[in-house]
Amino acid sequence: MPGLKLNLPRIISRNFNFCFFISLLPPALLSPLYPDIAQITPWLLWLAAPAANGLITALEALMFNRYFSNRNFTIFYDVSARYKLLAVAFCAGFMSVYINISVFATWIIALIVTYIAFRYIRNFIARISKLLRPAVMATLSDIGDFANFFVNLILSCAVINLAVDSLYHHFGSTAPFNFGQGLDAIINAVYFSIITITTVGYGDIIPHTPLARIIVAAECLTGYILLGLMIGIITRGI
């Protein structure tokens, strides 16, 4: 299967938020072993742990890409693009560790993830606008891109919500979502993003602050509009 050559900005747009999400899993699984961050050696906390997490994330991203591309679920990158993917994944894994130890880093990460999600949504809207033209039918490749986009959107929203929740924990304020800690927080954030974007909203997890309500409203409207467009494009060819 021939690889696809992509420039670095497009690889960042398509993969950074996904890589950032999977990079949260190793620290979450190991967090019970280190309940007090202050007791961890500084060089281990600020350099060794982020570097190790970056390497793990890079390997995970490469394996995910190879596994799903062999089943035509996603893009298979050529050699040069895979090196860029590894670099993006390493940076995402390196940065994700700081979300638990630095307020400033958490702010920066939240802004980066939000900006990348915005660019990805904008690029996706530009693409599906072409499929809204008369007599244009969605192909299997388009449907695969829809699925990739939807998963990326869910994980991007989960990361944004987790970052906002973490900021409030740093300041000792009331958590805007109260996802919990560690692996439970990740699971709850993904669950909440799914029911928000699909506009199900069971009400077991709710936003508690004005900022959280604004974020959730934006996520809900984004999911509602884009899901409607995607379903309309797909069913038009049936």
Stretches found by the model and what they are:
Residues 61, 65, 114, 118-122, ...:
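Alpha-helical transmembrane segments of polytopic integral membrane proteins
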Residues 30-50, 148-191:
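Outer-pore turret/helix-boundary of cation channels
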Residues 44-52, 144, 215-219:
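Physicochemical signature of membrane-embedded alpha-helices that form the seven-helix bundle of GPCRs
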Residues 13-28:
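Alpha-helical transmembrane segments
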